[in-house]
């Protein structure tokens, strides 16, 4: 510890820099008892915060920063998932059921193929079209025990099956019978003449882009 070199000075040391301050001795004289000055003394002022504590504080700040970033990413992911859910399940209007990118309507009474197609067109749809096995399985299960007209037809037994928009059927499931109009039974696709009354199924692409809303922040 540094010593004061001058009498009457009181030394305070901070960061190893010495400072001397005069401090008279208490007494009756102007400078203390008998006019004497107390010999200077040195004191060291030491910071109360240790480097270890500072490092701990830095560590806590870093951990909190990482936690905030992780939370922001999680909230952003949740927001994206909510938008996707709205697209998948909130797209179809009342009495229509959504699967994938389509909406399906199942009739409540039987009519012939021509009437069924006209009804679907009035709803801005067509007699049902399926493009994959998942959609076909859904239609078979959801229609119940009824045979239902779908959107496949052909000009004759010598011609290929087509959908109502005139695109050819890919024969992913064979169509039984010699009729010109197809219907869906419980476990197969069959054909018959158009005038027979059956239930029917309409389908159309969903319009989720018009209904999708971003959740509030």
Curated annotation (Swiss-Prot):
Segments in the Extracellular topological domain: 75-217
Gene3D superfamilies the record matches: Mannose-Binding Protein A, subunit A (3.10.100.10)
Cytoplasmic-facing ranges: 1-53
Subcellular location, record wording: Cell membrane
Keywords: Cell membrane, Disulfide bond, Glycoprotein, Lectin, Membrane, Receptor, Signal-anchor, Transmembrane, Transmembrane helix
Pfam families the record matches: Lectin_C
Disulphide bond pairs: 92-103, 120-202
UniProt topology in membrane: Single-pass type II membrane protein
Induction of its expression: Up-regulated in CD4(+) T-cells upon stimulation with CD3-ligands. Up-regulated in cultured calvarial osteoblasts by 1,25-dihydroxyvitamin D3. Constitutively expressed in cultured bone marrow cells during osteoclast formation.
Molecular-function GO term, any one: natural killer cell lectin-like receptor binding
Transmembrane segments: 54-74
Entries under CDD domains matching the protein: CLECT_NK_receptors_like (cd03593)
Primary location: membrane
Any Gene Ontology biological process: membrane raft assembly
SMART domains: CLECT
GO CC, one annotated term: cell surface
Superkingdom, taxonomy of origin: Eukaryota
InterPro entries xrefs: C-type_lectin-like, C-type_lectin-like/link_sf, C-type_lectin/matrix_domain, CTDL_fold, NKR-like_CTLD
Domain C-type lectin: 99-203
Tissue-specificity statement: Detected in osteoblasts, growth plate chondrocytes and skeletal muscle overlying the bone (at protein level). Detected in spleen, B-cells, dendritic cells, thymus, and in IL2-activated natural killer cells.
Residues bearing carbohydrate: 112
Matches recorded under PANTHER family: C-TYPE LECTIN DOMAIN FAMILY 2 MEMBER D-RELATED, C-TYPE LECTIN DOMAIN-CONTAINING PROTEIN 180
Function: Inhibits osteoclast formation. Receptor for KLRB1F. Enhances T-cell activation. Plays a role in splenocyte activation, T-cell responses and IL-2 production.
Protein name: C-type lectin domain family 2 member I
UniProt organism field: Mus musculus
């Amino acid at each position: 510890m540094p010593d004061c070199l001058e009498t009457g000075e009181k030394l305070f040391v901070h960061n190893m820099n010495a400072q001397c301050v005069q401090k008279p001795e208490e007494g009756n004289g102007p400078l203390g008892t008998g006019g004497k000055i107390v010999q200077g003394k040195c004191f060291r002022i030491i910071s109360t915060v240790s480097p270890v504590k500072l490092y701990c504080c830095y560590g806590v700040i870093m951990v909190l920063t990482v936690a905030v970033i992780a939370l922001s990413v999680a909230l952003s992911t949740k927001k994206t998932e909510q938008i996707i859910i709205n697209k998948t399940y909130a797209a179809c209007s009342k009495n229509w059921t959504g699967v994938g990118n389509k909406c399906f309507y199942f009739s409540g009474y039987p009519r012939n193929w021509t009437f069924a197609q006209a009804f679907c067109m009035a709803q801005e749809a067509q007699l049902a079209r399926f493009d994959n096995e998942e959609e076909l399985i859904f239609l078979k299960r959801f229609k119940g025990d009824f045979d239902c007209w779908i959107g496949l037809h052909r000009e004759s037994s010598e011609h290929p099956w087509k959908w109502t928009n005139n695109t050819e059927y890919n024969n992913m499931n064979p169509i039984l019978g010699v009729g010109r109009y197809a219907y869906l039974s419980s476990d197969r696709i069959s054909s018959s003449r158009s005038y027979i009354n059956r239930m029917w199924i309409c389908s159309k692409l969903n319009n989720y882009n018009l209904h999708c809303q971003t959740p509030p922040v």
